[in-house]
């Protein structure tokens, strides 16, 4: 649970402006938008699958930290005023029997056709990036205006009911002398994935080529930098694929919902 702290009105305005911009058709990755405000991932599954997914998230809190659950027919989250999860992500993915069948920028029609969907909002590692930057650690994909690289790893998640799958990880190249600071900062924020799950040696995670991510864009890795991997909120999409859930809606990786909760509210 986040701490109830005073929010800078300018930050609230920036978050609302970002949501309105997205609602009006902005279609790019959201890293760096409304800096300092929490961003979230999303997965919507049929009511019949909701308990299995809730249990899956509970058993895998580092990759699937649940920040809010919206019952069927509910599209506004307590995490943001004037919100609609059907329009306020820049891009959505539509899944049938574990296969992605479409990508859209407005999901109202699809939600209306599937009124039994239960939605889970999942913490996102974009929410610790401002803290990294404030500590003088460059976040490469923000600097280069690209999407964060994400990979389907060989780390098996704890299954629950009919749902199983492997962890998806995001990667940020960090100078070797700054890794300990990056670990300290992110470890204080378990609700947005917390400390890294792996440092260096991508092959240990089953990643054959770090320059060919499964989701997002490749990041430059300069001399003296080490690839650092965090659990990622795209893990539910890997579970959808592996478990052949009959229908689901998710965000597109890197295209997040921006809340009214400051990042620092999650710091322990």
From Swiss-Prot:
The keyword Lyase applies. Transmembrane segments: none annotated. Keywords: Lyase. It comes from the Bacteria. One of its GO terms (molecular function) is lyase activity. Its EC number is 4.2.1.-. It is an enzyme of class 4 (lyase). InterPro entries: D-Glu_cyclase, Putative_hydro-lyase, UPF0317. Belongs to the D-glutamate cyclase family. This is Putative hydro-lyase ABAYE2440. It comes from Acinetobacter baumannii (strain AYE).
């Amino acid at each position: 649970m986040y701490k109830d702290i005073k929010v800078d009105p300018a930050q609230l305005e920036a978050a609302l402006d970002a949501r309105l911009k997205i609602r009006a058709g902005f279609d790019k990755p959201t890293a760096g938008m409304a800096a300092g405000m929490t961003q979230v991932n999303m997965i919507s599954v049929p009511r019949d699958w909701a308990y299995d997914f809730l249990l899956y998230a509970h058993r895998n809190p580092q990759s699937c930290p649940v920040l809010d659950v919206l019952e069927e027919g509910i599209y506004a989250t307590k995490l943001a005023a004037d919100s609609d999860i059907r329009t306020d992500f820049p891009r959505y993915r539509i899944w049938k029997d574990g296969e992605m069948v479409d990508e859209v920028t407005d999901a109202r029609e699809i939600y209306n056709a599937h009124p039994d969907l239960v939605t889970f909002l999942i913490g996102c590692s974009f929410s610790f990036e401002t803290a990294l930057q404030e500590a003088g650690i460059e976040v490469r994909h923000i600097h280069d205006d690209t999407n964060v690289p994400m990979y389907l790893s060989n780390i098996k998640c704890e299954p629950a009911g009919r749902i199983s799958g492997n962890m998806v990880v995001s990667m940020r190249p960090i100078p070797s002398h700054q890794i300990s600071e990056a670990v300290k900062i992110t470890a204080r924020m378990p609700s947005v994935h917390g400390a890294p799950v792996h440092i260096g040696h991508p092959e240990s995670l089953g990643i054959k080529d770090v320059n060919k991510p499964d989701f997002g864009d490749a990041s430059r890795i300069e001399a003296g930098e080490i690839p650092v991997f965090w659990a990622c909120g795209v893990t539910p999409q890997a579970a959808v694929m592996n478990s052949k859930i009959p229908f689901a809606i998710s965000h597109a990786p890197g295209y997040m919902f921006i809340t009214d909760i400051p990042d620092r509210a999650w710091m322990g």
